[in-house]
């Protein structure tokens, strides 16, 4: 099922995206691990768009496109912020960064999803989770 959302940069608005997308995931019969991976990645990407992208400016929007089928879930999230260079984000697993509070969301997303691409100068993330159990 394809869906489109535009939400304000407000953490309370995340449920407007999360609930229907996760309902589509359930309807498409993803296993428990894949469902967890999609949920965590979607939440992290939305929080990152609001916090780091739009810097919690409620006048700026976050746009989301989702396409969930039994074979794959694709979610695209775009903010109105200045973007970032993914290559310049420090590795949160490196010893010197273990106590730093940032960078883990990106690591989670890239670990849990099958494919992740950062587009439009880091203002947009495209996440794909393949359903390995699809018939």
Predicted regions and their residues:
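Conserved beta-strand-loop-beta-strand hairpin that lines the nucleotide-binding pocket
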Residues: 1-4, 50-135
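Short amphipathic alpha-helical interaction patches enriched in hydrophobic/aromatic residues
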Residues: 5, 25-29, 53
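A short beta-loop-alpha structural element at the N-terminal edge
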Residues: 6-17
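Structural signature of the histidine kinase catalytic ATP-binding subdomain
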Residues: 9, 30-33, 57, 68
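Conserved short strand/loop->alpha-helix "switch" segment adjacent to the catalytic nucleotide/phosphoryl-transfer site
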Residues: 21-43, 98-99
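Conserved polar catalytic motif of the HATPase_c/GHKL fold
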Residues: 44, 48
